[in-house]
Amino acid sequence: MRLKDLIDTLTEQAKERLLSSNREHQFTPEALDKTAHQIGLAALKFADLQHDPKQNYQFDIDKFMRFEGKTGPYLQYAAVRIQSLLEKANLDSSGKSAIQSPADLPESARDVCIHLTRFPEIIQESLAHKSPNILCEAAFQLAQSFSRFYNAAPILTESNQSVRILKINLCQQTF
């Protein structure tokens, strides 16, 4: 199969998934096509990069197009979720939190922090071994960690302003 044909197939499958998720009303026809193309490319790129470059793998379109699990569309979904949250927060990033100790953070937020602090080391390891799959794994783990954080406690409706600012700042760092 030629690359262009594969991209077209992935784009069409992404478009079908968007339409079947009852989200078509959120898109103009042009935006739907563009979003489907972006999802298809993310699926292709992440599917290839997540595997050890020294190993063979079978490209499974259905598996790599899922919006859950270790896929490009899942990572895109996590990023779009964070971006949407930040737009709704409309917070000046100079906001400061009164929380001083990691012990004051919810466990799910601490887990995100741990993943974020390890990222520079992971990037270096990925470069040193010429293995982008290391970075892909870390990005997936961060997305999972953020999802747990997002689902564990309110962010935008947090009543404690200091904690709310901290959570939004953590979202900014993750994005």
What is each residue range found by the language model?
Residues 1-175:
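Non-catalytic interaction-recognition regions
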